[in-house]
Amino acid sequence: MRSSMLVLFLIFSAQAVAPIIGVLCSVTTAQQDHPTSIPTVDPKLFNKRRHLSPRVLFSSQPPDAEPAGGQGVSRRTRRQPQHRGVYSVCESVSVWVGNKTKATDISGKEVTVLPYVNINNVKKKQYFFETTCHSPPSGGSRCLGIDARHWNSHCTNSHTFVRALTSSENQVAWRLIRINVACVCVLSRKSWQH
């Protein structure tokens, strides 16, 4: 029930933002002549609420904390029980990613993520707060606490779309790109064998 509601929410969200996928940024003529140069972005663009996401950060130095309202590192084996018997079935790791160069936009097209931008003559790097599944050393990704006699299970990354400064076909623009935000358990019933 929850997963179907989540799927519907994602579909409606994607349809709602489809008309506003690429908000173009102002790029100077010199930057258009030299596409490898660092684009200068108008700081007023960051005042618009629709461009802000707690999972995207522009900073001149690496962030040392999780975003506001974030969940941080979620490792079931190292946490104290905080939720009175409620445990995560998939171990996950959350980190700020600063070396993202390529991403998939909401249209399914691969775009180039701008690693650096100039904001008020300060070179800032674009960081993304991503949560991915923690792979155990054995390589298995079975969900924890699932009855393996009756269920097949594996942990997989779940995604969302966030606004990021990207370049595609020589146009610098805000685009919705896909990032990893959770590690979820996928279940399927084992076939009944007599």
From Swiss-Prot:
Domain of life of the native organism: Eukaryota
UniProt GO cellular component terms: axon; dendrite; extracellular space; synaptic vesicle
Positions of disulphide bridges: 90-155, 133-183, 143-185
Signal peptide start-end: 1-30
Database matches in Gene3D superfamilies: Cystine-knot cytokines
Transmembrane segments: none
Predominant place of localization: secreted
Biological-process GO terms, alphabetical: cell surface receptor protein tyrosine kinase signaling pathway; modulation of chemical synaptic transmission; negative regulation of neuron apoptotic process; nerve development; nerve growth factor signaling pathway; neuron projection morphogenesis
Keyword field: Cleavage on pair of basic residues, Disulfide bond, Growth factor, Secreted, Signal
Pfam families xref list: NGF
Molecular function (Gene Ontology), one example: nerve growth factor receptor binding
Subcellular location: Secreted
Annotated segments matching region Disordered: 56-81
Function of the protein: Nerve growth factor is important for the development and maintenance of the sympathetic and sensory nervous systems. It stimulates division and differentiation of sympathetic and embryonic sensory neurons as well as basal forebrain cholinergic neurons in the brain.
Record-stated family: Belongs to the NGF-beta family.
PANTHER family listed in its UniProt record: BETA-NERVE GROWTH FACTOR, NERVE GROWTH FACTOR NGF -RELATED
Subunit structure: Homodimer.
Stated name of the protein: Nerve growth factor
Native source species: Xiphophorus maculatus (Southern platyfish)
